[in-house]
Each structure stands twice: as structure tokens, then as C-alpha cells.
Amino acid sequence: MAGGREIKTKIKSVQNTRKVTRALEMVSASKIRKAQERMKTSRPYAQAMKQVIGHLAQASTDFQHPFLIEREQVKRVGYIVISSDRGLAGGLNNNLFRKMLGEVRPWQDKGAEIDVVTIGQKASAFFRRVKVNMVGSVTHLGDSPQVEQLIGVIKVMIDAFIEGKVDRVYLVYNRFVNTMTQKASFDQLLPLPAAEHKVAHHDWDYLYEPDAASVLEHVMTRYIESLVYQAVLENVASEHAARMVAMKAASDNANKMIGTLQLVYNKARQAAITQEISEIVSGAAAV
């Protein structure tokens, strides 16, 4: 059994760790509310853009935007992967990466090449380690990311798709369901799925200046950017939720460990006192 001094040192160490985990839990609990507000605020914009594109696509029947055309043969697949910059978020990032590798494997079995654009330090480090072809990366977006920070890496994939270098693009991120649940999501970004640009038929019509095709050309890129931005906000909220839960679990485990160590310390102290009493009694009997 370890000595009393050694056990007290361990207790002190665990108590210090508990202070850190509690602080991180409280910080994440505070940040998650703001992250949820930003996430909910941006949703109506993406939904409105989706409706606009649906109307434009149906209004311009003689023009089909490249983003809406499904390609017969897929030779190269692009992924925009969103992760956190920091760790201590449980299995949030690793679960996403593991599922993505499972999604990639069938494409590789068909002979398709894989290109990846990463958003977040954890994704960048992971895909460098597994030697996947990274064509773009952005990190350190902070807790309040701006769409301007993402335009560069989004453009990399958009240009590759337009030029025919990539035949399909997926968006990979953690969707925020609630504080306890974050779901790894794989959304097809390009070409846009048919359901994305179909709207219910209405009797009214719109006038577009100069024409529907020109407006669609301009709006389409903004829509793709809004989808990626929304996914980043979802991932930020997921990160804070996962970290809050992970740090609470760590604090609870620290409490249990402190209780166990305290019990061991009390037993060791009791054994030492008992031994001292026995030695005193034995010494007195010898005299």
C-alpha cells in the first residue's frame, strides 16, 4: 500500500485536474448558447437561398447550371471536411474521421481518386497523417467564424468541379442535434441533389433581370458558400456541446477517484496508527 504522503500528493493532483475540467465545462456551457444562436440565425438565409435557386432553375428551362448536372462517370471525389481546432471534445472528431474513411473506401474500390479540403486543425493534422491528397486547408476560425474566412477553400472545390477535375463533392461535418447528441453528416454538395433545386409548382411567376440564367449563375456560388458556412456553425455548436459533456464526465470521474484515494488514505493512516499503538504496547510489556 502506498504511503500517506504519496496518496495525499495524488489526491492534490486529481483535485487540480478537476479544477481545470470544471472550468472548461463552464466555459463550453457559456459558449454553446452563443453558438446555437448563430447557428439558428443563419438557417433562414440558407433556406431562402434554396427556394430562390429552385425558382430560378425552373424558370430557366433552356439553361442548366453545371452545379445541377449529374455526371455519368465519377473519377474523382472531393470532400470538404469540417473539424474543431482544439481537442478535449470526447470522440467528436475521431468518430467523424472514422466514418468518413468508411465512406471513402467504396469510391476507392471503384477506382476513384480522393481530394480533401479541411476546415479545422484536427482535420488537417489527421489527413496529413493518413496521407490523403489535401488540396486546401483553413484553421483557427475561432468561436465566431465568418464566411469570408471560408471563401478560399470553398473556391478550390468549386473551381475543381467546374473544370472537371472533381466529379462530385461532399460536405462532412458534425450536425448539432442537441446538447447530448451530435451526428456525423455527409451531405452531397455538388452536383446539388435534385431535391435541393425542386420547388412546389405555383401559379405565380417572377421577372428576373437581366434573365433567370444570369441570376442563377450569380446566386449558385453564394448558396454553396452558405451551406458550408452553416455546416461550420453546426460543427462549432457540436464542439462546445461535446466538450461540455466530456469535461463533466471527467469531473465526475475525478470526484470518484478522489473519494477512492481518500478512502485508501484513511485506511493507510488507520493502519499506521494501529501499528504505532501495537509498538507502544509491546514496548511497555517488555519493560
From Swiss-Prot:
Q: Which GO terms describe its cellular component?
A: plasma membrane; proton-transporting ATP synthase complex
The record describes its quaternary structure and partners as: F-type ATPases have 2 components, CF(1) - the catalytic core - and CF(0) - the membrane proton channel. CF(1) has five subunits: alpha(3), beta(3), gamma(1), delta(1), epsilon(1). CF(0) has three main subunits: a, b and c.
Kindly state a single biological-process term from the GO annotations of this entry: proton motive force-driven plasma membrane ATP synthesis
Q: Which domain of life is it from?
A: Bacteria
Q: What is its main location?
A: membrane
How this chain sits in the membrane, per its record, is: Peripheral membrane protein
This chain belongs to the protein called ATP synthase gamma chain
- What is the similarity comment for this entry? Belongs to the ATPase gamma chain family.
| Pfam families documented for this protein | ATP-synt
Gene3D superfamilies referenced in this protein's UniProt entry, alphabetically: 3.40.1380.10, ATP synthase, gamma subunit, helix hairpin domain (1.10.287.80)
Q: What does this protein do?
A: Produces ATP from ADP in the presence of a proton gradient across the membrane. The gamma chain is believed to be important in regulating ATPase activity and the flow of protons through the CF(0) complex.
InterPro entries listed in its UniProt record: ATP_synth_F1_ATPase_gsu, ATP_synth_F1_gsu, ATP_synth_F1_gsu_CS
Recorded GO molecular functions are: ATP binding; proton-transporting ATP synthase activity, rotational mechanism
What are the entry keywords? Answer: ATP synthesis, Cell inner membrane, Cell membrane, CF(1), Hydrogen ion transport, Ion transport, Membrane, Transport
Where found in the cell? Answer: Cell inner membrane
Q: Which PROSITE patterns does the record cross-reference, listed alphabetically? A: ATPASE_GAMMA
Q: Which organism is it from?
A: Xanthomonas axonopodis pv. citri (strain 306)
Name the gene for this chain: atpG
Keyword DNA repair assigned to the entry: answer is no
